[in-house]
């Protein structure tokens, strides 16, 4: 096993622990808590894949971080922060909409790269909107936290989420997964719209119905 893979996991575990302590003191906002919950699932998946104990990894990560901080000067820290591009967090969904449980009468599930797609094929002839919470950098979608499909009545009928065991995806991966979800929902006569945030940062183009512009062979 590559040593960088192990040490990266150890540092991630310790930093998650620090963020959890921060949240436990009531100091985290909604986007912070969203990421905390998602990252916990990701760490569990990575730990299982690597065969590493999270508690042991957290202690090792603490030692690594302490060593780095001991060597770090304030001036170096300022230069590092200044050179890192900042990302923005965009939220179509409330925390309640993100954490709400839902079930499918006729489930269809598919894995597309590192993204997990689920939809209820029992839903027919409904108006559906896709909402997503994600981060943006350089005016492009950086990381998808969660995407869900809602009916006008507020019922959840579809979802796209990152697989904890396969971290990392591009805006193109998200676009492809959304097209799969849209195609599955429209198969039963549903009308699907995409939120303005997704239109702007994932596709940069749309048609008059608020839908992503699909390649010619898919129209």
From Swiss-Prot:
Keywords: Eukaryotic host gene expression shutoff by virus, Host cytoplasm, Host gene expression shutoff by virus, Host mRNA suppression by virus, Host nucleus, Host-virus interaction, Inhibition of host innate immune response by virus, Inhibition of host interferon signaling pathway by virus, Inhibition of host PKR by virus, Inhibition of host pre-mRNA processing by virus, Inhibition of host RIG-I by virus, Inhibition of host RLR pathway by virus, Interferon antiviral system evasion, RNA-binding, Ubl conjugation, Viral immunoevasion. It comes from the Viruses. GO terms for biological process: symbiont-mediated suppression of host cytoplasmic pattern recognition receptor signaling pathway via inhibition of RIG-I activity; symbiont-mediated suppression of host gene expression; symbiont-mediated suppression of host mRNA processing; symbiont-mediated suppression of host PKR/eIFalpha signaling; symbiont-mediated suppression of host type I interferon-mediated signaling pathway. A motif (Nuclear localization signal) lies at residues 34-38. Residues 1-73 are annotated as: RNA-binding and homodimerization. Upon interferon induction, ISGylated via host HERC5; this results in the impairment of NS1 interaction with RNA targets due to its inability to form homodimers and to interact with host EIF2AK2/PKR. The keyword Ubl conjugation applies. Residues 180-215 are annotated as: CPSF4-binding. The keyword Ubl conjugation applies. Transmembrane segments: none annotated. InterPro entries: NS1, NS1A, NS1A_effect_dom-like_sf, uS15_NS1_RNA-bd_sf. Homodimer. Interacts with host TRIM25 (via coiled coil); this interaction specifically inhibits TRIM25 multimerization and TRIM25-mediated RIGI CARD ubiquitination. Interacts with human EIF2AK2/PKR, CPSF4, IVNS1ABP and PABPN1. Belongs to the influenza A viruses NS1 family. Inhibits post-transcriptional processing of cellular pre-mRNA, by binding and inhibiting two cellular proteins that are required for the 3'-end processing of cellular pre-mRNAs: the 30 kDa cleavage and polyadenylation specificity factor/CPSF4 and the poly(A)-binding protein 2/PABPN1. In turn, unprocessed 3' end pre-mRNAs accumulate in the host nucleus and are no longer exported to the cytoplasm. Cellular protein synthesis is thereby shut off very early after virus infection. The dsRNA-binding region is required for suppression of RNA silencing. This is Non-structural protein 1. The lineage of its organism: Viruses, Riboviria, Orthornavirae, Negarnaviricota, Polyploviricotina. The gene is NS.
